Amino acid sequence: MDQGTPHIVLAGGGTAGHVNPLLAVAGAIRDIEPTAQVTVIGTAVGLEKDLVPEAGYELDTIEKVPFPRRPDLYMLRFPAKWKRETAKVRSILETRHADVVAGFGGYASAPVYATAHKMGIPIAIHEQNARAGMANKLGARWADFIGTVYEGTGLKPRAGADVERVGLPLRPAIASLTKRIGDDRAAVRRESAAQLGVDPNRPLVLVTGGSLGAQSLNRAIASSAADLLAHAQIIHLTGRGKISEVRELVTASAGADVLTGIGPESAGQGDYHTAEYLERIDMAFACADLVICRAGAGSVSELAALGLPAIYVPLPIGNGEQRFNAEPVVNAGGGLLVADKDLTPQWVHEHVPDLLADHERLAEFGRKAWEYGIRNAAEIMARHVLQLAEPSK
């Protein structure tokens, strides 16, 4: 073991929402302290199994240990499974000579928090949601530092813990875009527009419901194509398996001639650009004047960091978690919040064209979003993690 090298173990995964911030902080740690040994504990079934090795980090895997939520057979098996996986975590932390553990939520985090606490290893937590998940609620009991994206997450830190709103560590493509648009937003817009086949000199609305799409959002926007196209171009990312219905609704509203795809070959072919998914969504962000989307924590944080006005349509499930994600930036003046049940073609007709025509209001939304957004969250979080590693070097 190199006594002068910080050994940092990051824990979390399952979804991109957990893995992307983890990898952003890992990269920031290496930027600040190139000698740091950074490894990750995750599961063999989450996105981390591919994304972590691809990013150049070693991944140690444990099984998922979700907390039981009802009295059933799993509840009876849970204690033995928890004991087995925490023993595995102890072995990993000993082998990795962990000086500090930083968790990002998800199934892998809870046993890592519990084991690190018993071993006396400092703990840092990052909570990206407005309402914290169960793993981070557990870890908050022992954490030395808690970084959040929102105030009022429901976490209950121990006495003496440091809690700070650090923001969401951004994906590399988005972090790079925040810097580039800060230097010359118009130039970045022109470059991205050429790649997407859109007109850089005409307003653009980006519509996205995520990789799976959002049926209510798709239908309300596509059915309003004629109203919207009078004021702007549209990039509509429909989600997998939903593009045919969107194109049919657009055709019924504005005619088939307005439809085209996304890419340089689409330039001049039509103003309603459709695709199921766009790998380089940062390019669409660079061209957008308004975004209409769900209100996942990642989406809200990225749009705020980029200073993009948005109409947020929270997913109508659970306890309204997505609404809590969007409320702070909307209350700060960075966009609008619309309930899923209220997003109808009539609502779009009555509100969106007027917003697109009111350039000053749209610009003010963008300014307020930029002021609310945090662009250096990965660096802030990384410095706190490295600071916790110092006493154990």
UniProtKB/Swiss-Prot annotation:
It comes from the Bacteria. Belongs to the glycosyltransferase 28 family. MurG subfamily. It comes from Bifidobacterium longum subsp. infantis (strain ATCC 15697 / DSM 20088 / JCM 1222 / NCTC 11817 / S12). SUPFAM superfamilies: UDP-Glycosyltransferase/glycogen phosphorylase. Cell wall formation. Catalyzes the transfer of a GlcNAc subunit on undecaprenyl-pyrophosphoryl-MurNAc-pentapeptide (lipid intermediate I) to form undecaprenyl-pyrophosphoryl-MurNAc-(pentapeptide)GlcNAc (lipid intermediate II). GO terms for biological process: carbohydrate metabolic process; cell division; cell wall organization; lipid glycosylation; peptidoglycan biosynthetic process; regulation of cell shape. Transmembrane segments: none annotated. Its EC number is 2.4.1.227. One of its GO terms (cellular component) is plasma membrane. It is an enzyme of class 2 (transferase). InterPro entries: GlcNAc_MurG (IPR006009), Glyco_trans_28_C (IPR007235), GlycoTrans_28_N (IPR004276). This is UDP-N-acetylglucosamine--N-acetylmuramyl-(pentapeptide) pyrophosphoryl-undecaprenol N-acetylglucosamine transferase. UDP-N-acetyl-alpha-D-glucosamine binds at T15, A16, G17, N129, R171, S211, Q322. HAMAP family: MurG (MF_00033). It is found in: Cell membrane. Pathway: Cell wall biogenesis; peptidoglycan biosynthesis. It catalyses: di-trans,octa-cis-undecaprenyl diphospho-N-acetyl-alpha-D-muramoyl-L-alanyl-D-glutamyl-meso-2,6-diaminopimeloyl-D-alanyl-D-alanine + UDP-N-acetyl-alpha-D-glucosamine = di-trans,octa-cis-undecaprenyl diphospho-[N-acetyl-alpha-D-glucosaminyl-(1->4)]-N-acetyl-alpha-D-muramoyl-L-alanyl-D-glutamyl-meso-2,6-diaminopimeloyl-D-alanyl-D-alanine + UDP + H(+). GO terms for molecular function: UDP-N-acetyl-D-glucosamine:N-acetylmuramoyl-L-alanyl-D-glutamyl-meso-2,6-diaminopimelyl-D-alanyl-D-alanine-diphosphoundecaprenol 4-beta-N-acetylglucosaminlytransferase activity; undecaprenyldiphospho-muramoylpentapeptide beta-N-acetylglucosaminyltransferase activity. It is a peripheral membrane protein. The lineage of its organism: Bacteria, Bacillati, Actinomycetota, Actinomycetes, Bifidobacteriales. Keywords: Cell cycle, Cell division, Cell membrane, Cell shape, Cell wall biogenesis/degradation, Glycosyltransferase, Membrane, Peptidoglycan synthesis, Transferase.
